[in-house]
Each structure stands twice: as C-alpha cells, then as structure tokens.
C-alpha cells in the first residue's frame, strides 16, 4: 500500500484565507474535532486532518467562490475523488466552499450537508462535472471513473458552506471564555497570522511525486500544524496585547488582599516585572508558554465551576 503526492499547489491569498477557515472548522466546529491533532497542508489535499496516532484522515478541498453551480462543485471534488480511489482510507471527504447556487440544496438553511440535501438534478450535474474533470487528470485512472465508485464517493462527501467571518473562527479557538478578547481587530490579526503560518508550510520543500507507504510518513515533510500550535499562537497574541496595562485582574484580588496595604504598589510592580521577565525571557520562553497553555486549558475546563480555594 502506498500513496503518491500529486497536484500540490501554491495558493493565492483569497484561497489561503478559505483554507484557514477550513482548518479552524476542522479544529473546532465538528463533533469529532477533538480527535484531530495534525493539520497537514497541501500534501494529500488543500488540507488534511490527522489524529494523534495517524489512524484517521479527514480530507478537505476548499474553494472560496460564493455561487458555485452544481457542475462547478463536481469539478472541485476531483482531488477528493482521487483520494477516495487511492490505497489509503480517509474518514471523511469535505468540500469547504464559500457558497453554492440556489439550485443545489433542498433545504437552503443547512450549511453542512451530504448528498441527501442535494436536489436530484444537481446530483446529476455534479456527477457530470466530476467525470469531466477526472478524465482530464493524469493522476486518476480511467478504470477508476465508474458509476459505482462515483456513487459510493458522493455518499461520503460532506459539503460545508463558509458562513462566518475570520474573527468568528478565531472565537471558536477560545470557546468557553468568549469575553477573553472583544476587539475585532485583534481577532482578525490572529486569523491572519494563522493563515500566514499555514501558507508558509507550502514553501518548505517540493513534494510533488513523493511516495509514502504509511500515513504517518506525511509528518516527516513538516507541512503540518498541530491543534496545540494554533491554540498556543492564539494565546500568545492575546496575552501579548498588553497584560500589564489593564491593571490587577479581579481573580488576583484575594492574593493581593493578603498583602499589607502599604506594600500594594510594590507587590503589584514586582508581579508585573516578573510577568514581563517571563514573557520576554527567550531562554525559557518555550517552557513558559507550555505552562501557560496548560493553565489556560485547565481554566477552560473548569470555567463554570465555583472557586473552591483562594491561593
């Protein structure tokens, strides 16, 4: 069993934005999002999710256009179909798009749907577009373009329509604590940084024609981000806004109240100095952010629980 990398590509800025939205959709907006640990960029497809043990793959093709016709959708499915007929098994095949024409859906209120919500006439046009595009691709064998394969493939495809702003996708990263960041410009800046980091993975090395024998070998080419990478980047940018300018956090008041009033200012200044030193100490920055990530994750888990102890 093997997999040959074909049709990797460089993406325009608009396409990169859609791919980042797709990444954050995989990471935060699915019932199985917690299973996905790696986000592999432009290797199997535009984006592919992988679990920690490389047992499961979630395949994503993205297209930012808003009014995709049924036939256009069919053509966009070609790389997903390529992976459907390959030796590797994928858990899900996702077409992430900016929008579809009003002739596609039975229920236009559903923005995540399978073939059961596509009109019969649109299904036929999707098949026509897929067959036409598949026949033009050298990486798909004519013998694989059969009615049986296409019907089985379409039964497994999920179409997801992008219905959120970049800032809304970033909010899903800090779910459980929505008031952590309120400024739209901060959220947009975080999204752009995730987008740029994701896009930079395409430039690491040429992989066209690479052959791998197992799914986990894809990680050796370093074209991936992890869920922790994205969460930590987000947390760093939030903390680095200006953690000192806003004064003493309410949650810190019980600790401050144990200090003699005449020492308040000195104590606060000492804490702020220590925080600044930790933030900008390059020798221990990795350990600091790893600790802070764990503290933050525990805070999200226990955010709704009453405080039992005062430190």
Please provide the spans of the model-predicted regions:
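Acidic metal-coordinating catalytic centers involved in nucleic-acid phosphodiester chemistry
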Residues: 1-12, 64-300, 304, 308
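Catalytic centers of nucleases
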Residues: 9-13, 17-82
């Amino acid at each position: 069993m093997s997999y040959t990398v074909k049709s990797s590509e460089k993406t325009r800025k608009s396409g990169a934005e859609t791919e980042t939205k797709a990444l954050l959709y995989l990471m935060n907006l699915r019932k199985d999002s917690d299973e996905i640990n790696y986000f592999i960029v432009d290797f199997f497809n535009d984006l592919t999710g992988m679990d920690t043990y490389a047992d499961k793959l979630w395949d994503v093709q993205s297209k930012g256009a808003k009014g995709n016709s049924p036939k256009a959708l069919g053509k966009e499915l070609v790389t997903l179909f390529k992976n459907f007929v390959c030796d590797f098994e994928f858990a899900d095949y996702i077409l992430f798009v900016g929008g579809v024409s009003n002739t596609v859906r039975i229920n236009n209120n559903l923005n995540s749907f399978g073939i059961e919500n596509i009109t019969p006439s649109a299904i036929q046009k999707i098949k026509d577009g897929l067959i036409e595009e598949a026949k033009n691709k050298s990486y798909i064998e004519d013998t694989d373009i059969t009615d049986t394969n296409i019907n089985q493939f379409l039964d497994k495809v999920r179409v997801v329509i992008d219905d959120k702003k970049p800032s809304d996708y970033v909010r899903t990263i800090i779910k459980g604590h929505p008031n952590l960041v309120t400024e739209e410009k901060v959220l947009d800046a975080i999204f752009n940084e995730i987008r740029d980091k994701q896009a930079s993975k395409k430039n690491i090395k040429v992989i066209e024609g690479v052959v791998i024998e197992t799914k986990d070998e894809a990680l050796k080419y370093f074209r991936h981000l992890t869920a922790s990478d994205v969460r930590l980047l987000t947390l760093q940018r939030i903390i680095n806004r200006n953690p000192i300018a806003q004064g003493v956090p309410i949650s810190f008041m019980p600790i401050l109240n144990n200090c003699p009033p005449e020492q308040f200012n000195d104590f606060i200044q000492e804490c702020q100095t220590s925080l600044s030193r930790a933030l900008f100490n390059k020798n221990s920055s990795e350990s600091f952010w790893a600790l802070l990530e764990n503290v933050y994750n525990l805070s999200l888990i226990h955010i709704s629980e009453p405080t039992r102890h005062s430190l």
